[in-house]
Amino acid sequence: MNPLFLIPAVLVIAGVCFMIYMNKKHQSAKSEIDLDFERNKYDVYKQEVLAQDFPQIKQWMKGKSIDAYTSASVPQSTANKVQDVISDGIKNVALSAIGVKLRRIETECFWVLSGSDLHFFSTNTVGELDEHVVFDNFRIEEATLQYGGILKSQLGVYLKSSEEYLPKTHIITFNIDGTPLSLEVHDRLNYVPDPTDILNMNKQLITRVKYQVVGEKFVKILQDKFPNLQVA
């Protein structure tokens, strides 16, 4: 038999063995993490993650306080609605009022709570600032918040076993001159593993934990400041 015919079989077996090995490493590393204990480090992680992983947020805020921050996204329904408005050639006064050119954004987006203002940032494909929208306390006091479930744009991308790492969302809806405008709040910062850390499962998991600890506190801090955002 030509040895070349054995190569595909060898690759498949090697792939299966690698997956089993990585799964064991994942389970071992995961068992060493106490999420409740890690949540007590929120203040430390908030500063550490901001300084080391997302320094651009401080740059965009230009010296303003950063009371809480997390990842964000534009719901598909909102993007479709805006797209319909654009395609119909209708001037959307509500969107113009806040100066945001909403579309289906697949690039990084962030929320930052600063004092009584909510800042929404979107980036372009190279991570540079694209849009910066500020919702003041009057807008927020008229807003509503509801649970939105797992981020729908990412469904199907991950295996079922990895669902625990998918961001869960809340949907904040603003009343902009009588027109509802909905945006998503993630319960964790978006994590993209560094290729050099592909075998370092401990580092991957602790980074995910830090991002979750920082992100999931955002809604609670927001609700404490704005009681009208309590979820029924």
Residue ranges and their predicted role:
Residues M1, Q52, F135-D136:
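Intrinsic-disorder/low-complexity regions
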Residues Y21, Y42-Y45, Y69, Y147, ...:
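Sequence-level detector for tyrosine residue identity
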Residues L95-T169, T179-P180, L189:
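Phosphoinositide-binding peripheral membrane targeting modules
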